[in-house]
Amino acid sequence: MENGGRPSVGQVILLTTSSAITALFYSIYRHKYRSVQTLKEAKKFCLTDDLPAVLSDLPGKCVPYAVIEGAVTSVKEVLNSQYVENCKGVIQRLSLKEHKMVWNRTTHLWNDHEKIIHQRSNTVPFDLAPENPGESGVSVRVLRPLEAVDLGLETIYEKFHPAVQSFSNILGHYMTGERPKGVQETEEMLKIGATITGVGELVLDNKTIKLQPPKDGMLFYLSSMDYEGLLEKQEVQMRWWRILSIVFGVASCITLFFILRRKYRHYKEKQHLKNLQREFEESRARQRVQQEPQNKEEVQNPCSICLSTEKSCVFLECGHVCSCISCYQALPSPKKCPICRNFIDRIVPLYNS
C-alpha cells in the first residue's frame, strides 16, 4: 500500500485541526451549559418592602446568584447625550469604528473589515427601582455595571462618515491592499426609566441592597430582555455550540475511520503477501524435488525482470504472466504491471509443471 499504510499529510492535518476545534467548541459548550444551569437555578426576587428582611435572615446577608427586574433610576447626577437632546442616562458608550476593504491574497477578493479605533464608556451610580413610579418598594444599587457580559445599551445615535476618494488614493489602496470606506460614529446609552434584568450577587450592606458581579465564575447580566428572554437567548447559544461540537466531532471520527481503514488494508495486504510467499516457496520446493539436479538446464520461462527465476505469478486484472514473486515485491507502490502499466489489484500463484 502507498506510504506503507501511513496516513497522508492531509489526513493528519485534518484530524489534528478537527480534533483541536472540537475540543475548543466543546469547552465553550460546557461553559455555556454551566452558565445556563446556574441561570436557571438563580433565585428571583421582587423589589418589595420585605426584601431587606429576607436578605437579613440569609447567611452573610447575601444571595450568591439572584435575578432582579426593575427600572433604571439615577442616584444623583445623570449623563446627557452628546448628540440627542433631552436624552439622559446612567451609562454612555461612544465608539468610532473604521470600515475598510482588505485584499485577500488567497481568494483574490476584497473583504469587509471592521476595527474599533476608539471607544469610551462613562457611568454614574444608579439603582433599579420598581417599574411603576407610584408602587411602593425598595431600590437596588448596581455596582460595577461595565463588567456585565450582556449590557442592555440602546443605540441612540449613529452616523457614517464616508472616506474621501481621489485618483491618487485609489492607486495607493491597490498598492497597500486596503481600501478605506469610512468611519462610523455611534453613541449608546442606558437611559433613565429603561427596564432591565439584573443577574448577579445580591447583598444587604448597611441597609443598602446592592447588585454586584457574582463570584465563582458566574456571569453578571444587565439585560434589556426579561428573565425568560435572557434564558432563551443563552440556551440558543448553548445549542449552537453543541451543534458545532458534534459536527467537528463527527468530522474527526470520519477522518480517524479512514486512517484506521488504510492501516487495516495495509495489514491485510501484508498478510496476503506473506501467504503468497509461503505458497510460492512450497511450490518451488515441490519443483526442486521433481527435477533431477544433474539434468538441470537453463531456466525455462524466465522472469521478464530478473531473467534468473521462473515466472511464478499472474497479475490481475490484466492477466499478464511476466514476473516472479521477488520482483513483484520489489515493484514500487502503487504496483503496476511492467507490460501494460495497469494497476495490479491482486496476484495469484502460477504453478509450473
Swiss-Prot record:
Gene Ontology cellular component annotations, sorted alphabetically: mitochondrial outer membrane; mitochondrion; peroxisome
Keyword Lipoprotein in annotation: no
Annotated metabolic or biological route of this protein: Protein modification; protein ubiquitination
Subcellular location: Mitochondrion outer membrane
Mitochondrial intermembrane side: 30-239
Catalytic class of the enzyme: transferase
Keywords: Membrane, Metal-binding, Mitochondrion, Mitochondrion outer membrane, Transferase, Transmembrane, Transmembrane helix, Ubl conjugation pathway, Zinc, Zinc-finger
Domain comment (free text): The zinc finger domain is required for E3 ligase activity.
Name of the molecule in the record: Mitochondrial ubiquitin ligase activator of nfkb 1
Molecular functions per Gene Ontology: identical protein binding; ubiquitin protein ligase activity; ubiquitin-protein transferase activity; zinc ion binding
Record-level GO BP terms: mitochondrial fission; mitochondrion localization; positive regulation of canonical NF-kappaB signal transduction; protein ubiquitination
Quaternary data: Homooligomer.
SUPFAM superfamilies linked to this entry: RING/U-box (SSF57850)
InterPro entries from the UniProt entry: MDM2_MDM4_MUL1, MUL1-like, Znf_RING, Znf_RING/FYVE/PHD
Pfam families, A to Z: GIDE, zf-C3HC4_3
Gene3D superfamilies in the record: Zinc/RING finger domain, C3HC4 (zinc finger)
Organism encoding this protein: Xenopus laevis
Domain of life: Eukaryota
Keyword Transmembrane: yes
Transmembrane segment boundaries: 9-29, 240-260
CDD domains hit by this protein: mRING-HC-C3HC5_MAPL
Record field: catalytic activity: S-ubiquitinyl-[E2 ubiquitin-conjugating enzyme]-L-cysteine + [acceptor protein]-L-lysine = [E2 ubiquitin-conjugating enzyme]-L-cysteine + N(6)-ubiquitinyl-[acceptor protein]-L-lysine
The EC number(s) this enzyme carries: 2.3.2.27
ZnF bounds (RING-type): 303-341
Membrane topology: Multi-pass membrane protein
High-level lineage: Eukaryota, Metazoa, Chordata, Craniata, Vertebrata
Topological domain spans for side Cytoplasmic: 1-8, 261-353
